[in-house]
Amino acid sequence: MSTPMILRESRTSTTFSDQLLENAKSVGCSPPSTAPGDIDPGTWDKIKNHPCFSEEAHHYFARMHVAVAPACNIQCNYCNRKYDCANESRPGVASEKLTPDQAVRKVIAVANEVPQLSVLGIAGPGDACYDWKKTRATFERVAREIPDIRLCISTNGLSLPDHVDELAEMNVDHVTITINMVDPRVGVKIYPWIYYGQRRHTGIDAARILHERQMLGLEMLAERGILTKVNSVMIPGVNDEHLIEVNKVVKGRGALLHNVMPLISNRIHGTYYGLTGQRGPEAFELQALQDRLEGTKLMRHCRHCRADAIGLLGDDRGHEFTLAEIPDEITYDASKRQAYRQLVARERGDHLVAKNEANRTVMSVEYGGSLLIAVATKGGGRINEHFGHAKEFHVYTVSQRGIKLAGRRRVEQYCLGGWGEVATLDHIVVALEGIDILLCVKIGDYPRKQLTQAGLRATEAYGHDYIESALGALYAAEFGIEPPVKTATA
């Protein structure tokens, strides 16, 4: 029996909900999700539905952040917190601050309409551990109303050691710490001040205290079996080379994942780095650094989430769920989320088979080169996005070593109102520099021609296929080997 497609076009409509239920019924019993070979089953069970901790999960599951923690105890040179901003896509920004009660109401509304939702996080817009009373109250109330949702926090780590035991008691089993240095001499270039022990600290003293508290918190989390992801901002000329040492240190202290993110530096954001002209890294610089890191598993699918982000990574739906749109009284209905999970279990089983076949194909090539391939996707692990509608492209390296996600390239949407913008296309061509081939479900003649002139081949030939199946078949065609039988896509 063929696998039903995961529909996403009418995401909040009754038709979509009904289709999910019908699809879930049609697939019957679902096979269990299998842990990858490099992850133990216990860890896999915790991360398999968390879109930030599992690259595979981000194709299928959504996260939600609630902006209940505006207070912060450090100042970073790359941060300018904003609490009523709808236009910027970066950490520390939210459209509206919430009380714990408002947050619970919003979480129920989202859970009822977004069946992909699996995780609730508190990531500010300040610091979740420093603004602890609001964080704790929110988690306690959400856990009572929606007991099957996973809880996680993001923190700078300064106040983390004070609350690790409480996090464990509340079954918070995923924590992200932003660690940009393990040498206070580097830290003084990133943090003007911290607030700790009832007073403000500056200079080397501030960086030293922050470092010591971050390391203590990381060790305490590891001792209690709480999974930790470390975020690091790559700041060219400040900590880029130093992040190699950061990677080694955080692995030794128990971090599961390391996510190296590019500095977002724009004057209009009002950050110190933005106003002083500190540049962010180019895409190739970020990838080159990531490729040099050894130790923890790397997260390469980060989206720089806002403090009020909602939805699949790369598809923020926060604007659909403002407080004004949510009823004062609302009851949780688990049926959509339960049906969706049944559907996804079957889809993931088929996807895993296709992924393994594709990797066997490319690794069987005796003489083959390396390809850098961009993919337009809107979820489900498939090539299912029109070139003109894409706001980002997933980038994969394909070689005899296998198929690996290398990162993503952000772009402006080319096609608006049915027409493409020439200036936007020029920027897309620049953003895709170094890419050999682009895969999408549809592309117009003009953008295809412009990409070809820039040395980039675009093709619709693998539309709606699993990404890895398409990459394997494409690699086989490029290097003259027999590809596996094509996996059914509908």
Swiss-Prot record:
Residues that coordinate or bind [4Fe-4S] cluster 1: 72, 76, 79
Cofactor, how bound (note): Binds 3 [4Fe-4S] clusters per monomer. One cluster is coordinated with 3 cysteines and an exchangeable S-adenosyl-L-methionine. The two others probably act as substrate.
Radical SAM core domain: residues covered: 58-308
Stored Pfam families: Nitro_FeMo-Co, Radical_SAM
Top-level EC class: lyase
GO molecular function, one term: metal ion binding
Statement: the UniProt record of this protein carries the keyword Membrane: no
The UniProt record lists the keyword Iron-sulfur: yes
Cofactor: [4Fe-4S] cluster
Pathway named in the protein's UniProt entry: Cofactor biosynthesis; Fe-Mo cofactor biosynthesis
GO biological process assignments: nitrogen fixation
Signal peptide: none
EC nos: 4.-.-.-
Residues annotated as binding S-adenosyl-L-methionine: 78, 126, 178
Record-listed [4Fe-4S] cluster 2 binding positions: 302, 305
Function of the protein: Involved in the biosynthesis of the iron-molybdenum cofactor (FeMo-co or M-cluster) found in the dinitrogenase enzyme of the nitrogenase complex in nitrogen-fixing microorganisms. NifB catalyzes the crucial step of radical SAM-dependent carbide insertion that occurs concomitant with the insertion of a 9th sulfur and the rearrangement/coupling of two [4Fe-4S] clusters into a [8Fe-9S-C] cluster, the precursor to the M-cluster.
Family according to the record: Belongs to the radical SAM superfamily. NifB family.
Protein's name in the database: FeMo cofactor biosynthesis protein NifB
Organism: Rhizobium meliloti (strain 1021)
Name of the gene: nifB
